[in-house]
């Protein structure tokens, strides 16, 4: 069986994309079915033919602006049947791009207010 060619794409201006992207990559590297490539903070990766070799994109990106060429590259690639996994801040990417937000199925508005709460460990096993 061929491995799933997977692009781990991390970047943006708010979250620690380097640390989190590396962690995502390391976790996924334990899956023998995946052939991984990592790209950090380079939106040209979303332009065809750069996405063409991949079957799956694991997307950890925050905020930013996407050009029409990048948007069309990503949306057409997904529409062709390829896989998109948006991680955490993916819903807060490309705020001014309604087509991207429609593909993701929603968007980030705000974090709730911080508050104190109690955690009870019932069963540590």
What are these regions (language model features)?
Residues 2, 90-125:
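An acidic, glycine-rich "communication" segment
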Residues 28-29, 77-78, 100:
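A generic structural signal for well-ordered alpha-helical segments
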Residues 16-17, 46, 66-67, 92-97, ...:
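Short catalytic/ligand-binding loop motif for oxyanion handling, primarily in non-cytosolic enzymes
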Residues 48, 76, 109-111:
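Short secondary-structure boundary/capping segments
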Residues 8, 51-94:
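Short alpha-beta junction capping motif
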Residues 1-53:
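Aromatic-Pro/Gly-enriched surface loop or interdomain linker
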């Amino acid at each position: 069986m061929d491995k799933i060619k997977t692009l781990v794409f991390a970047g943006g201006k708010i979250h620690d994309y380097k640390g989190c992207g590396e962690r995502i990559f390391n976790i996924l590297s334990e899956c023998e079915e995946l052939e991984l490539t990592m790209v950090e903070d380079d939106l040209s990766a979303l332009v065809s033919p750069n996405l063409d070799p991949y079957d799956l994109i694991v997307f950890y990106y925050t905020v930013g602006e996407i050009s029409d060429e990048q948007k069309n590259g990503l949306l057409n690639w997904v529409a062709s049947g390829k896989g998109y996994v948006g991680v955490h801040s993916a819903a807060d990417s490309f705020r001014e791009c309604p087509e991207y937000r429609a593909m993701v199925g929603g968007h980030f508005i705000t974090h709730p207010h911080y508050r104190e709460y109690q955690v009870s460990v019932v069963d540590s096993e």
